[in-house]
């Protein structure tokens, strides 16, 4: 059992574990003093491989392995079928040396294919759209260059190293060289760009950045406390920004370059319980406070005279947000912990649906408003379809940038 106790702020969280004979964690229960219990569990096979993980809401993630103990399939709560103890999930295939060759998502779409050299380093990466990335290596195994092959073959990155194996230069996809100066510890002391601009860095004996110099010669200085945290930052004009910390290392005071102060007190988890902001003269005070339950979840926040309350369901998800006792918004979640319904103060409900990969596929309400989302195999939005018939379609280039965007209403093109 583990216990986190902060009597001053009402936190008393206990975590209990149950183990099998092999030392594997079977159950984890997070307990609060108000009767809260968030329990998750894990099942193992005879080879001590995790086969089922169940979250507090009962959602099951299933893992299946090949005869060489490699993960061959991972099924999310959206794809898991208890009746068959199986379902649609992400599948992996390997070569005889254990290198992952192919990743296929739960819809059967090939996400990525890999090829390796004799050193088991990936030399070719290919996605479902045929975009092919090739990598070459130095004799010591460091990446030499990265190339994109296909209709427009080009080099994406080239790397140069010194005798110690430290990067001293990079040539980007536009053939712009960037040079790096390094000290005997391998720390970057200068960066030179193709236009002649150079940036510089200096360090403390402990290896922290003590001074930076931008391309215009402007310097920013940094000072640190005994714990290695920044205590002062002196900008290019000589103005000082001050930082102070409590005994746990949490920021307790921040004074900006104009003298504005922010005082803060935190609980045992580093979460703020009190903040006081003032101007340089100590006026125009703004105080905020936060209250937490025994598990460390925020239950009340007060700022500018407004009070907000937070209520959670039995599985630890945010259920309701209130202001001065009035409900602002309420939430419903599925077994995977994703929001399925949001209800506003007027009782208007907005619902959310997800596909088998856990991607948001539909948003709708009782007034007939609806939006549907489609995705490609790389989890990028490929289309957005609105209830009024308007649809926006997206295509992407080999670097993942949007190549085309077209909005249509029926056969009429509205935007392209």
Go through the PLM ranges and name each one:
Residues 1-172, 176-193, 197-214, 218-235, ...:
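Beta-strand elements of repeat-based all-beta scaffolds
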């Amino acid at each position: 059992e583990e216990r986190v106790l902060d009597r001053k702020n009402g936190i008393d969280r206990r975590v209990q574990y149950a183990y099998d004979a092999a030392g594997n964690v079977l159950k984890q229960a997070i307990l609060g003093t108000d009767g809260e219990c968030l329990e998750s569990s894990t099942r193992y096979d005879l080879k001590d491989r995790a086969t089922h993980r169940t979250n507090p809401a009962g959602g099951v993630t299933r893992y299946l392995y090949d005869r060489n103990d490699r993960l061959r399939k991972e099924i999310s709560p959206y794809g898991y079928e208890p009746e068959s103890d199986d379902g649609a999930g992400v599948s992996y295939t390997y070569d005889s040396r254990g290198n992952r060759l192919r990743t296929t998502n739960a819809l059967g779409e090939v996400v990525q294919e890999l090829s390796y050299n004799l050193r088991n380093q990936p030399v070719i990466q290919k996605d479902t759209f045929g975009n092919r990335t090739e990598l070459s290596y130095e004799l010591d195994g460091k990446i030499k260059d990265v190339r994109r092959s296909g209709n427009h073959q080009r080099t994406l990155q080239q790397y140069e190293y010194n005798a110690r194996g430290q990067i001293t230069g990079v040539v980007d996809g536009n053939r712009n060289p960037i040079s790096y100066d390094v000290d005997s510890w391998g720390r970057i002391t200068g960066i030179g760009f193709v236009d002649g601009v150079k940036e510089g860095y200096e360090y403390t004996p402990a290896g922290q950045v003590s001074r930076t110099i931008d391309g215009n010669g402007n310097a920013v200085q940094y000072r640190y406390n005994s714990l290695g945290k920044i205590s002062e930052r002196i900008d290019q004009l000589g103005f000082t920004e001050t930082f102070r910390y409590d005994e746990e290392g949490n920021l307790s005071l921040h004074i900006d370059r104009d003298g504005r102060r922010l005082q803060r007190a935190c609980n045992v988890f580093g979460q703020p319980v009190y903040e006081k902001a003032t101007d340089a003269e100590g006026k125009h005070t703004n105080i905020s406070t936060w209250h937490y339950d025994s598990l460390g979840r925020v239950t009340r926040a007060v700022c500018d005279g407004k009070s907000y309350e937070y209520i959670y369901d039995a599985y630890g998800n945010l259920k309701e947000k209130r202001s001065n006792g009035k409900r602002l918004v309420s939430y419903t979640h599925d077994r995977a912990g994703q929001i399925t319904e949001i209800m506003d103060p007027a009782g208007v409900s907005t619902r959310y649906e997800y596909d088998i990969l856990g991607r948001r596929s539909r948003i709708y309400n009782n007034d007939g408003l609806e939006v549907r989302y489609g995705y490609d195999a790389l989890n990028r939005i490929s289309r957005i379809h609105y209830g009024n018939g308007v649809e926006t379609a997206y295509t992407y280039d080999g670097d993942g940038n949007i190549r085309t965007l077209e909005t249509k209403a029926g056969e009429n093109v509205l935007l392209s």
